[in-house]
Every structure is written in structure tokens, then in C-alpha cells.
């Protein structure tokens, strides 16, 4: 054995020192790069379409603009979590800051996690995705009816919302409410506030997003395994993926209670009990952090890329990231088993969002390229989450995500040709000039959006990714408006120009003339009973649009009009009562909830709301 010389020892020490210095510099360089990227995100919030020369916003300013108390962000880059950070406060009373360890309600972003858990049971040969789910259900069965004669509801149908499940949601509960069991929710029996879960479409006929689709999945997992849903999901998902700050328990431990965010309504008031209880845990019951959820996303990405064998197999994980079954032509996404899938010029993004009372969460991650982001807030302003996602996309150079355009001057001759009113189904759209700029707006909206020319024939709006084009009709030469798909440039909608003197019945409501509006709707109903604008559901949707925009007089008048047109429907009285409650008209709310119950004694939602109002008297 040769003894090292002094010279060799000196060379070795020098080499080790240089290696240490290189690693230190590399580490410092990576840290600096991360700090720069974080700053770009924090100051890069922008609109859905970015116009060159537009300024951007900071996270702090937009939180203040919307009135959002706290937000947690986790950014994924190169298949790993690049950073996670909190902003603002988790509770207005304690002023405790949001950190990366603060828990938020994941809301409907729970569904991909549940789907992952169900697929792990498939992997263990306890379930078959294409089997009739009633083969596994013991405590309850999907009701057999005319829609399940030919096709049975499968696990796969439920995971991607193609089962034809009704109703859409199952509701949430205050901490002092009587909380229903899962079987009571499935049967729609008191104290559950939802209608019974059933099917009203044939499986695979269409896709219809429904929280209620995941309630049979939860019951199936309970019946197959025998433990609580929280215990099952801990073993199948949370523990293997090291999601150590996550739980499906609706009663949090004292330690987690200290770190949970308090939910706030859009008016800034606190949700009673700091947040609602969600016994339908499979659809919206997960408590988690942005960082923990990012661990879930990176596992899916790494598994799909063959870089991880932790948790679910690659073959089954692929089912989460591939479109399954029919698609909904009105959606900008397709559905895998759990995730929504967005195709941006063949770049596939895994996406989901969720809204619980006082909480909003959204995730966006490239299926194949190892980048993404999770944004969670303790208030409900979806556009803020979208602005943060766009800031991350811009800072980290995501492929085909954020459209950027240069503004082109609009000729006077074009302005004169395209201004006017256009009609799409039940919607009237106005194109008008104001202050040397073009604007477009739905007549139900208060404000318009600037219409920006970006090429010889294409226009955009800052809040919509689709293109707009104006072209003359081949037969009569009349200018029509077209919505153009950004990916393949196909026409998605044709909006016909209409006479500016013809009024839509809803315009009388907007002008405050209730009697004229009622007469116009009655006339339309008599002349065209099948007209889509006269249906109970459409008018109800208009009422809720005003309701969510806090235009309460319009909301009340719309629901009132619907009651007069459809006096035998329990739903119209329920909606009017809800608006009365929000407007502080407690006596009217009680009266109309009672009327709704009189018409439908099984309206558990109305019964619960009525009890809440009567308690407060």
C-alpha cells in the first residue's frame, strides 16, 4: 500500500475545497434564482389575456382589492416542489399569519385525491372499475330506474361524472347542526338537506359535474374496507405520499385547529364556526396545505414519467390524466378519472378547482412536463386564484398557457360596422364605443370589457382566452360575431346581429319595470311555450346571477316573477326565500320556505334554512 505524499495530500485538500466552493456557489445561485422567481410571481398577477404594455399587480394589492384574508401557494418546477409560501392571515381575530403549514379546506379539489384512493383499491384487486357499483355497495344501492335498465352505474362513471347522478350537490353543515350519516345523505332523509341521490340520465350518455357522484364512491369504500373514510384515505394516499399536514377528519385535533384557516364570506364576515362541516368527505372534505397538495400532484407527475413507484401504479395513474367517455361541448376541458384536463395546443394540464363556504382552491399542473401550482384561499374569489396561476405560468415560462398580444388600432369603418346588439341563445350581447374604445358586454352585466384588435381579423378581451371575429353573412351580408377556439381556430359559437329596437323581456327588469317584464314573459310563454328563455330553470339562473353579484333588488324581482309564472313549483319559492334571507327580509323568507315545504315536504334544504331562521328570531 502506497503512503500519500505531502504533495498529494495538498492536492486532495485543494480539490475538496474547490468542490465545496463550487457546491456553495451552485446552492447560492439556485437560491438567488428561486428568490427572483418568487418576486416575479408576487408582482406578476395579470388578466386571462395579457396585452403588451399592460401593468401587472402584486399579490398584496390583489388580496386587498378582493378582500382576501389569506392565501397559500405551492409552486412545482422540474417535477419537484420549488417553493411554498403563505401570505396574509389565517384568522382576523388572532392575526396569525398564513404559513406553508396552514390548513385550508380543499373543497372539490378533494375529488382527484379520492379518485386516487379508489384506484389504489382497484390495484389491490378489491374493486373493478367497470363493475356495477351496486355489486360493492351494502348499506345502500344506486336506485334502479328507467335510466339504469340497459346500462348500470360503474365506478368509472362516478369518478368522471358520467353516471347521470342527480342532484348536483349534497350541501354542508354548521358545527351546531345535526350532522347526517352518509346513508341519510344518500337517501335524502332528515337531517340531510339534499334530495335523494339517484340517476336521471343513462350512464355514459353525457357528463355532468356533480359533487354527489362521489358520495356513492365514499360509501362503497366504507362497505368494502370496513374502516372510516379518514382511516382508509390515510393508509391509501396521505401516509404513502407524506401528506403529513392533511386529514379527512371533520373534527380537527387541537394541534391542527391552531393551524387551520378560518373561512370568510365575500362580504368579509366569518363563516359560522370558522368553516362548514362536510360529511360527504369524498367530494369536498379534505383539509390540507398547498404544499401537501403539491406533494400529491408531483407524485402523479413523477409516476406518469416513470420516476416514482410510490403509491399508485403508472397504468392506473394514466387513467387520471386521459380523457374518458363523452365530453361536454360547453366545457373548456375534458374529464379523466378525478382530474379535469385542459388541452392548450397539445399541452395537457391537470386542473381542478373547488368552492366551499369561505374557502376556494385551484390547482393547475402540466401532466407531462413537471410544473404546476396550488393556490388556496380562505375566501371565495376565483379570479384571484387564476391571476396567481397566470403569474406562475409567466414567471416559469409554461408552454402555451398565457396568451400575450399586441394591441392593433381599429379603423373607424370597422367600428361603425360592428357596433350593435347580438344574440346568442338567451343572451343579448352589446358592442359599443366609449371614449374612443370598443367594449362588449352581456346586457345582464353592469360593466363592459374592452374589445381589443390583435390582428387583421381577430379581437380579444382581457378576461377570455377565446378569439372574437366579425364577418358578414354569406346570404344577407349582415355582420355576425363569432367565438373562435384559440387552439384549433374552429368556430365555437355564432352570435347573430339583431335589431336594436327589439327588447328582451329581462331588459324591463333591468329598467325597474316589473309589470312590463311580467307581461313580456307571459306573452312569450303563450306564444312560444318551449322558448328556452321562459323556462323555470333559466329564469332561476338569472335570479342567482343577480344574487351572486349582490344586485338584490333585481334578484328578488326575478325570483318573484318566476313564482308568478310557475306557482306550483317548490323550487321557485325556495329561491325567493333564499334571496329574502340575504336581503334581511326574514318574515318573507320564512313564509316562502314554508310554501316550498308545503309543495314538497321532502325539501330538506328548506326545512334546515327555516329552522335556522326561526332559531334567530
Locate each region found by the language model.
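Active-site helix/loop module of the DD-peptidase/beta-lactamase fold
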Residues: 56, 105-109, 121-170, 219, ...
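Short, charged, amphipathic alpha-helices and their helix-cap/turn boundaries
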Residues: 51-55, 135, 174-202, 227-246, ...
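Catalytic loop of the DD-peptidase/beta-lactamase superfamily, centered on the K-T-G motif
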Residues: 25-85, 170, 222-227, 231-235, ...
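Short active-site loop at a secondary-structure junction
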Residues: 62-72, 94-157, 198-212, 281-284, ...
Amino acid at each position: 500500500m502506497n503512503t500519500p505524499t505531502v504533495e498529494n495530500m495538498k492536492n486532495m485538500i485543494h480539490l475538496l475545497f474547490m468542490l465545496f466552493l463550487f457546491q456553495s456557489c451552485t446552492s447560492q445561485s439556485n437560491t438567488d434564482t428561486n428568490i427572483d422567481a418568487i418576486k416575479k410571481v408576487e408582482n406578476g398577477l395579470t388578466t386571462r389575456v395579457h396585452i403588451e404594455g399592460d401593468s401587472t399587480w402584486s399579490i398584496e394589492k390583489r388580496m386587498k382589492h378582493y378582500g382576501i384574508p389569506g392565501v397559500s401557494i405551492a409552486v412545482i418546477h422540474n417535477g419537484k416542489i420549488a417553493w411554498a409560501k403563505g401570505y396574509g392571515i389565517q384568522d382576523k381575530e388572532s392575526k396569525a399569519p398564513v404559513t406553508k403549514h396552514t390548513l385550508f379546506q380543499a373543497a372539490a379539489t378533494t375529488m382527484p385525491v379520492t379518485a386516487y384512493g379508489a384506484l389504489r383499491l382497484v390495484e389491490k384487486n378489491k374493486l373493478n372499475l367497470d363493475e356495477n357499483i351496486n355489486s360493492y355497495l351494502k348499506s345502500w344501492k344506486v336506485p334502479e330506474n328507467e335510466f339504469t335498465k340497459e346500462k348500470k352505474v360503474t365506478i368509472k362513471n362516478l369518478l368522471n361524472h358520467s353516471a347521470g347522478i342527480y342532484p348536483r350537490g349534497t350541501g354542508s353543515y354548521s358545527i351546531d347542526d345535526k350532522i347526517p350519516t352518509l346513508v341519510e345523505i344518500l337517501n335524502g332523509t332528515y337531517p340531510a338537506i339534499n334530495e335523494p341521490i339517484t340517476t336521471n340520465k343513462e350512464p355514459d350518455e353525457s357528463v355532468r359535474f356533480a359533487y354527489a357522484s362521489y358520495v356513492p364512491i365514499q360509501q362503497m369504500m366504507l362497505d368494502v374496507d370496513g374502516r372510516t373514510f379518514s382511516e382508509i384515505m390515510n393508509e391509501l394516499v396521505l401516509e404513502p405520499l407524506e401528506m403529513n399536514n392533511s386529514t379527512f377528519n371533520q373534527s380537527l385535533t387541537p394541534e391542527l385547529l391552531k393551524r387551520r384557516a378560518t373561512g370568510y364570506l365575500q362580504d368579509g364576515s366569518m363563516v359560522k364556526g370558522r368553516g362548514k362541516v362536510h360529511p360527504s368527505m369524498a367530494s369536498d372534505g379534505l383539509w390540507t396545505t398547498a404544499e401537501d397538495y403539491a406533494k400529491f400532484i408531483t407524485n402523479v407527475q413523477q409516476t406518469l414519467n416513470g420516476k416514482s413507484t410510490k403509491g399508485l401504479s403508472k397504468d392506473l395513474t394514466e387513467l387520471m390524466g386521459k380523457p374518458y367517455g363523452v365530453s361536454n361541448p360547453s366545457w373548456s376541458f375534458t374529464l379523466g378519472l378525478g382530474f379535469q384536463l385542459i388541452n392548450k395546443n397539445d399541452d395537457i394540464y391537470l386542473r381542478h378547482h373547488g368552492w366551499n363556504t369561505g374557502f376556494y382552491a385551484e390547482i393547475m399542473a402540466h401532466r407531462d412536463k413537471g410544473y404546476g401550482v396550488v393556490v388556496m384561499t380562505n375566501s371565495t374569489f376565483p379570479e384571484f386564484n387564476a391571476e396567481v396561476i397566470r403569474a406562475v405560468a409567466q414567471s416559469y415560462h409554461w408552454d402555451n398557457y398565457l396568451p400575450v398580444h399586441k394591441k392593433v388600432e381599429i379603423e373607424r369603418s370597422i367600428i361603425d360596422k360592428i357596433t350593435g346588439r347580438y344574440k346568442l341563445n338567451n343572451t343579448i350581447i352589446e358592442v359599443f364605443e366609449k371614449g374612443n374604445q370598443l367594449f362588449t358586454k352581456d346586457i345582464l352585466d353592469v360593466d363592459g370589457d374592452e374589445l381589443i384588435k390583435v390582428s387583421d381579423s381577430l379581437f380579444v378581451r382581457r378576461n377570455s382566452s377565446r378569439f372574437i371575429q366579425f364577418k358578414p353573412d354569406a346570404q344577407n351580408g349582415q355582420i355576425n360575431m363569432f367565438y373562435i377556439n384559440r387552439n384549433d381556430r374552429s368556430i365555437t359559437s355564432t352570435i347573430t346581429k339583431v335589431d336594436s329596437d327589439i327588447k328582451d323581456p329581462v331588459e324591463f327588469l333591468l329598467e325597474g319595470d316589473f309589470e312590463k317584464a311580467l307581461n313580456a314573459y307571459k306573452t312569450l310563454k303563450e306564444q312560444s311555450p318551449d322558448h328556452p328563455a321562459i323556462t323555470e330553470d333559466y329564469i332561476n339562473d338569472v335570479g342567482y346571477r343577480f344574487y351572486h353579484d349582490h344586485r338584490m333588488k333585481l334578484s328578488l324581482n326575478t325570483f318573484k316573477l318566476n313564482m308568478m309564472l310557475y306557482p306550483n313549483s317548490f323550487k321557485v319559492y325556495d329561491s325567493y326565500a333564499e334571496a329574502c334571507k340575504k336581503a334581511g327580509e326574514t318574515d318573507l323568507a320564512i313564509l316562502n320556505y314554508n310554501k316550498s315545504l308545503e309543495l314538497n315536504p321532502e325539501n330538506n334544504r328548506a326545512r334546515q334554512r327555516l329552522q335556522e331562521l326561526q332559531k334567530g328570531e
